[in-house]
A protein has these predicted regions:
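Non-catalytic signal-transmission and effector/linker regions of two-component phosphorelay proteins
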Residues: 1-17, 23-43, 49-52, 56, ...
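Conserved active-site segment of CheY-like receiver
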Residues: 20-21, 105-109, 129
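Conserved phosphate-binding and hydrolysis motifs of nucleotide-dependent enzymes
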Residues: 21, 76, 84
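Short amphipathic alpha-helix used as the core "switch/output" element in two-component signaling
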Residues: 60, 85-98
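Active-site residues of response regulator receiver
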Residues: 75-77, 106
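The feature encodes the CheY-like receiver
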Residues: 80, 110
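Alpha4-beta5-alpha5 "output face"
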Residues: 92, 115-119
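Short, glycine/charged-rich "phosphate-handling" switch motifs in NTP-dependent
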Residues: 123
Length: 162
């Protein structure tokens, strides 16, 4: 995978990749971003295989103008085809993505899930809020911390041609 900027889409907005299979949760997240007036572009994929394809820039996600690398990944754990933990393991094995912040956003509060997520390299593990306003607040805090205040590792330079 080629080295690309992880910071912005074509409009200059930071990109959040939401990996979520529940259409109701996707709709709530989109509404929460709008209500919080977050200056971000949200891309959504519905399962673990689609998340890997998006991040790898393969198939329908080959155009980085339309499918830019994210500045932040919001990852559910309970996904069809490939679990969130498997996606996280794959993300951390990719040099172009190994420093991209991954926030697990899930309904699971199982100690085993929490332990595995952190062991595999999650930057944060958050339980999905029950109330809509809680989600608005949570996304606002994530935006403020990960996309505005946190200093991330700059993307690695592209390797020199031989």
């Amino acid at each position: 995978m080629e080295s690309m900027s992880h910071e912005a889409d074509m409009a200059g907005l930071p990109v959040i990749l939401l990996v979520e299979d529940n259409p109701d949760d996707v709709l709530l997240a989109r509404r929460a971003v709008k209500k919080a007036a977050l200056p971000v572009a949200m891309q959504v994929v519905e399962d673990g295989d689609e998340a890997v394809a998006y991040l790898d820039g393969s198939g329908q996600f080959g155009d980085r103008g339309r499918s830019p690398l994210p500045a932040l990944i919001l990852l559910d754990l309970k996904l069809p085809k490939r679990s969130g933990l498997e996606v996280l393991r794959w993300v951390r094995s990719q040099p172009a993505l190994d420093t991209t912040p991954v926030v697990v956003l899930t309904s699971s509060s199982e100690d085993e899930d929490i332990q595995k997520a952190y062991t595999l390299g999650a930057n944060s593990y958050l339980q999905k809020p029950v109330a809509f306003n809680g989600l608005v607040q949570l996304l606002g805090m994530l935006d403020l911390y990960w996309l505005r205040n946190n200093l991330s590792v700059p993307p690695a330079p592209a390797p020199a041609p031989h």
